[in-house]
């Protein structure tokens, strides 16, 4: 079989499966519990958190694990909105975002008073940077754009979006 949807779901690398097997069969304990296999689970999570933090130049306590991309997207948008709503209520995203982003933006509009601007894309799915830049207001607290579209393969100009956010808004928060 030839599999052409790696942008959406990729087969797990064999070395990852091998590294994870003990936690599916031997050390499957709840890391918040006090029994021995729980301690092994907690050790692995702590070590993984430290390794990821080191790669990202972050502190281990700044690393959170979620069940997947949709949960992460929901959390990023809702948490950012709640944390910065005293500075503004405007979010910018694109019309072609993943439903996890679009539905969360709709929720924030209807339930939390957010103002969301959905900027367009060109025929290749690339965000219209002029439209994005024009959408920035003093109330803008977040720009959320997917780095690469899993359906059409478009790679967005993330560095340019970050530059625009910092230059015009001074908040500089972007969710990619």
Labelled PLM ranges:
Residues 1-173:
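Pyridoxal 5′-phosphate
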């Amino acid at each position: 079989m030839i599999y052409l949807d790696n942008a959406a779901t990729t087969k797990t690398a064999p070395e990852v499966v091998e590294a994870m097997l003990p936690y599916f069969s031997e050390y499957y304990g709840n890391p918040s519990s006090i029994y021995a296999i729980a301690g092994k689970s907690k050790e692995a999570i702590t070590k993984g958190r430290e390794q990821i933090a080191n790669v990202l130049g972050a502190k281990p306590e700044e690393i959170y694990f979620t069940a997947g991309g949709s949960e992460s997207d929901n959390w990023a948008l809702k948490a950012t909105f709640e944390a910065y709503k005293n500075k503004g209520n405007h979010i910018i995203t694109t019309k072609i975002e993943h439903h996890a982003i679009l539905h969360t933006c709709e929720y924030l509009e209807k339930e939390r008073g957010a103002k969301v601007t959905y900027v367009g894309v060109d025929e290749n799915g690339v965000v219209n940077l002029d439209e994005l830049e024009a959408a920035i207001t003093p109330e803008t607290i977040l720009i959320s754009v997917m780095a690469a579209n899993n359906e059409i393969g478009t790679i967005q100009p993330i560095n340019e979006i970050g530059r625009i956010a910092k230059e015009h808004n001074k908040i500089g928060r972007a969710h990619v």
